Amino acid sequence: MRFLFLLCCWVISFPTYCGAVEVTPQVEQWGTAEVSLPGPSKGNPFSDVLLSAKFYEGETSIEVDGFYDGDGVYRLRFMPEKQGKWRFVTKSNVPELDAQEGEFTVTAPTGNNHGPVRVANTFHFAYADGTPYKQLGTTCYVWNHQPAELQAKTLETLADSPFNKLRFCVFPKRYKWNENEPELYPFEGKPPRTWNTERFDPKFFQHLDQCVLELQKLGIEADIILLHPYDEGHWGFDRMTPVEDDRYLKYVVSRLAAYRNVWWSLANEYDFMTEKREEDWERIGELVAAEDRFEHLLSIHNGKRLFNQTRPWLTHASIQNGSAVEDPARAELFRDAFRKPIVFDEVKYEGNIPKRWGNISAEELVHRFWAGTIGGTYVGHGETYLSPDDILWWSKGGVLKGESPPRLEFLRKVLADSPAEGIDPIDKWQNPEYAGKSAEYYLIYLGKEKPTEWLFKLPNPPQLVGLPPAEKMTFTAEVLDAWNMTVTPVEGTFTLKKLDDYFYGDTKGRKIKLPGKPYQVIRIKRVHDSD
């Protein structure tokens, strides 16, 4: 009879296993497989219970930590990077959670599932399946702490925007234009300062899960800011002890690391968190990198003092520096210094608030995006227009009011048409306005200059195996207006001849006519025999 009962249990619940262990039966490659188990709710499940599981397929084996999700439910999340049949077995100090086994099937990815974003070609990014990722991010620091209706409006706005990354905070923010209390808090307790940091509020983190997944549906990366200084003791989340920090970070990573669109930002303006020292950030960075078994991108954002961006656990440099992207040459220097992708996540914001960091023009912000791009780096957007209801995009989200987003959509289309490997400086020591892929694709950004013509000339193309001699290379040209969002083809083609030690020009010595306006870009592409 007992055998018959077990057989019925297996048939009825497959692939939900006996003992009420539930597992996602089928998941896409780079999707999220979730295992749910019932367990003890007495005492403090967050600290008393240890739970992990080993997931394996063939010779591949990955161990992840589980977490308590409230109401007697424990979860383990896993992001499979291989297709096939995966199995798991749990390990716990609680007998009812220990040695639980199961399996699930991983299928091919569909739709906009290209996997997590990784570093590619030293200075650039690509999804795990090799699809290029050209970062065009924006910032809504605490959109996730606003009323549900406003959160929905933010997602609606993002869906119709050019942005493919959103920076936002786990913890709420206390700052000018952002003084409302959130509806949920990360810990059990009583606001504003009475918290039991040993007990998390699962509802807070369940909502965070949902925010990440909503962005994933839109194809937007979630650049999650784990710590920030915009508290100043109001809640005290910026002044937790190292033990409290570590416990919180482990919990967040165990919950979110299995979502493919997650990026980690250890802190925003880390150096403004005066309670922490450099060794604290080293510990925090090493901890997050070690706890994340899926190796998501990881960065730390600066205020006035740059962090040591050469640290091996930092995958890319997240930089605040508006002047660095006023021209391409300055932006490019950061690449040489750190030898990894550079994302200028904060270059000041389009807006009109009475703060110098939040009142640059749309023209200036768009210019900085282009200058950063030509420097072989990436730039982030923000918007701070005053509003009677204190809903500013940079903090609370809502709707975009500025003039830069349509121009950034134009840039997005240009980037989508650019070389998959990324845009790199071509003549950085002398003519930093040239970028692209030498001998194949060029963007020459003239910035704030207002020329009426441009002599066709290209820095010496490389003489590599598979490339024709320079004198046999032919190119087409277009004039792009970065502000007016126009593309004007230039008539005819251009065949190279040597001008001097550094440049090749057109055999006919032609010049390209320009409108005498700023923000002009000349796009040049080599003509192939198959074209």
List the predicted regions and their residue ranges.
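Positively charged n-region of N-terminal signal peptides that target proteins for export
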Residues: 1-4, 256
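Bacterial N-terminal signal peptides
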Residues: 5-16
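Non-catalytic, glycine-rich low-complexity segments
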Residues: 21-59, 64-67, 103-109, 115, ...
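Aromatic- and carboxylate-lined catalytic core of secreted/periplasmic carbohydrate-active enzymes
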Residues: 22-25, 44-45, 131, 350-353, ...
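Aromatic sugar-binding surface patches on proteins
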Residues: 34, 69-77, 502-508
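Extended acidic/polar, glycine-enriched regions
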Residues: 54, 60-122
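Active-site mouth of glycoside hydrolases
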Residues: 111-327
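Extracellular glycoside hydrolase catalytic/binding regions
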Residues: 247, 268-406
